[in-house]
UniProtKB/Swiss-Prot annotation:
Protein family (similarity comment): Belongs to the WRKY group II-e family.
Domain of life: Eukaryota
Annotated Basic residues bias: 107-116
Biased composition, class Polar residues, residue ranges: 190-220
Organism whose genome encodes this protein: Arabidopsis thaliana (Mouse-ear cress)
Subcellular location: Nucleus
Region (Disordered): 75-116, 181-220
SUPFAM superfamilies: WRKY DNA-binding domain (SSF118290)
GO-annotated cellular components: nucleus
Induction of synthesis: Induced after flagellin treatment.
Main location: nucleus
DNA-binding region boundaries: 122-188
Full protein name: WRKY transcription factor 22
Amino acid sequence: MADDWDLHAVVRGCSAVSSSATTTVYSPGVSSHTNPIFTVGRQSNAVSFGEIRDLYTPFTQESVVSSFSCINYPEEPRKPQNQKRPLSLSASSGSVTSKPSGSNTSRSKRRKIQHKKVCHVAAEALNSDVWAWRKYGQKPIKGSPYPRGYYRCSTSKGCLARKQVERNRSDPKMFIVTYTAEHNHPAPTHRNSLAGSTRQKPSDQQTSKSPTTTIATYSSSPVTSADEFVLPVEDHLAVGDLDGEEDLLSLSDTVVSDDFFDGLEEFAAGDSFSGNSAPASFDLSWVVNSAATTTGGI
């Protein structure tokens, strides 16, 4: 025993104690597979760890969802940015469309300038134009006493041909005719049948005058016949009015017999009339005939 208490023995004892301690600590883990007591504890530890894991998983899912929601939040304000882009595209497209419109206007102006034609025509040659025109407006010109007339082609509705006619200031016998655009149809063959022609106006005036002349002729003939018929009756009544104005003879109201007229003829044949009475050449045949007609009508 004394030999065992040297330095080497102490070192050996310490190493043995440490090895034994390690073996004792590790041994329950090895024997836990066979010992049911330790197995129950391991199962309870496993169950508790699973429960803790189950309790922890919702928080992890919520954290994941919240992380995704945080990622989605900046995406929402991006939507109006996407909506603004079509507006910019529409604005850019509008600018693009506006460019050809300006080019079209410039082209149309160029076309008008190219198709414009100015001619100096005498007053006598204005009616010799091959095309048919209709006047649709008139406008005064500054510094000129003569107005300017505007004409369009009357042959076709879709024709864009126009004409401007104005009298020359320096030479009033000359006219300045400006043609714009071109005709899209052939020249008309019959000018009399065109709308807006002034050749038919005299015929219309003649037709308008003819009813008045016929009415005048019809109205004049009955008046003259009535005058010729009425005037002799007035003369005869004035001659037969011997007693006064109250005893006028009315053939329509009285019935006269034939003996009365025979007595009148004998009375007219004698010389019993004075100087103020009717002459001997007075003929009562007209009165007799008229009285006969009235009696026959009654």
